[in-house]
């Protein structure tokens, strides 16, 4: 692992809304547009390499926005991809404070394979999902509407009941609709541009390295214990 596991997340209390998407889907831009802050969610210079989970308070400490690591970037080593697929599934299915998932997908290439896998995991966890067709400014109005219609048809084929909207971080289009959906999940009136950055963050620097090392040691111990039990 090159990053902490979800076991290092804050206590599983309150309400969380997670943002997920492929490494080039515009996730950081969407979060920054929603919060009206340019660098609240930072984009890595190497897409897919940033494997930090970032938490931000939304109004109070019991309501959080969770910025999940981007997925699907080809240059990421296969072993790292497998590790994070396991972690993402565990988080989506078992995190009791998770109230909803905002899934971002590029309107020009919507619902790639791993996007659909994320939706299946969310369904397994009975988690509501709101889909953003990002970068809507890249298409003309008619093409955007067709993409929206076709994505709805695909969701129906998959047997998934998700809300969906057009979104443009560049033009700040769709912010109020997104804030309304999140507000319902938070059970809290939420306004775009008024999300407050959390005073806490996950570990960084040497503390992060220590946490990663401890987690790796614990995983090895668990595997050895399991192997010993099976051999008896």
Curated annotation (Swiss-Prot):
Q: Which GO terms describe its molecular function?
A: GTP binding; metal ion binding
Q: Please list the cofactors this protein needs.
A: Mg(2+)
Give the species. Answer: Psychrobacter arcticus (strain DSM 17307 / VKM B-2377 / 273-4)
Q: Which residues bind Mg(2+)?
A: 28, 50
Role noted for this protein = Necessary for normal cell division and for the maintenance of normal septation.
Could you say which residues bind GTP here? Answer: 21-28, 48-52, 67-70, 134-137, 167-169
Q: Which PROSITE patterns match?
A: G_ENGB (PS51706)
Q: Which PANTHER family match?
A: ENGB-TYPE G DOMAIN-CONTAINING PROTEIN, MSS1/TRME-RELATED GTP-BINDING PROTEIN
Gene3D superfamilies from the UniProt entry: P-loop containing nucleotide triphosphate hydrolases
Its family?
Answer: Belongs to the TRAFAC class TrmE-Era-EngA-EngB-Septin-like GTPase superfamily. EngB GTPase family.
- Residue ranges occupied by any EngB-type G domain in the UniProt entry: 13-188
UniProt keyword list: Cell cycle, Cell division, GTP-binding, Magnesium, Metal-binding, Nucleotide-binding, Septation
An example of a Pfam family matching this protein is MMR_HSR1
Q: Which gene encodes it?
A: engB
Query: Tell me, which GO biological process terms does this entry list?
Result: division septum assembly
Q: Which CDD domains match?
A: YihA_EngB
Protein name in UniProt: Probable GTP-binding protein EngB
């Amino acid at each position: 692992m090159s990053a902490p596991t979800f076991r290092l997340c804050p206590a599983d209390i309150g309400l969380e809304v997670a943002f997920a998407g492929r490494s080039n889907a515009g996730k950081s831009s969407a979060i920054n547009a929603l919060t009206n802050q340019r660098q609240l969610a930072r984009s890595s210079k190497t897409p897919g390499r940033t494997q930090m989970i970032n938490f931000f308070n939304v109004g109070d400490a019991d309501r959080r926005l969770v910025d999940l690591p981007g997925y699907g970037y080809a240059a990421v080593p296969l072993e790292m991809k497998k590790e994070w697929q396991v972690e993402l599934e565990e988080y989506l299915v078992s995190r009791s404070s998770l109230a909803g998932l905002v899934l971002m997908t590029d309107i020009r290439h919507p619902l790639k394979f791993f996007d659909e896998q994320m939706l299946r995991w969310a369904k397994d966890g009975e988690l509501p999902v709101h889909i953003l067709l990002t970068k809507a400014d890249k298409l003309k109005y008619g093409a955007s509407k067709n993409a929206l219609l076709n994505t709805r048809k695909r969701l129906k084929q998959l047997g998934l009941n998700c809300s969906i909207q057009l979104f443009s971080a560049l033009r700040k289009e769709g912010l109020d609709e997104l804030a309304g959906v999140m507000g319902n999940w938070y059970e809290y009136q939420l306004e775009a541009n008024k999300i407050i950055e959390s005073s806490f963050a996950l570990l960084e620097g040497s503390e992060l390295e220590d946490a990663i090392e401890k987690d790796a040691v614990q995983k090895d111990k668990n595997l050895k214990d399991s192997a010993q039990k099976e051999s008896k």
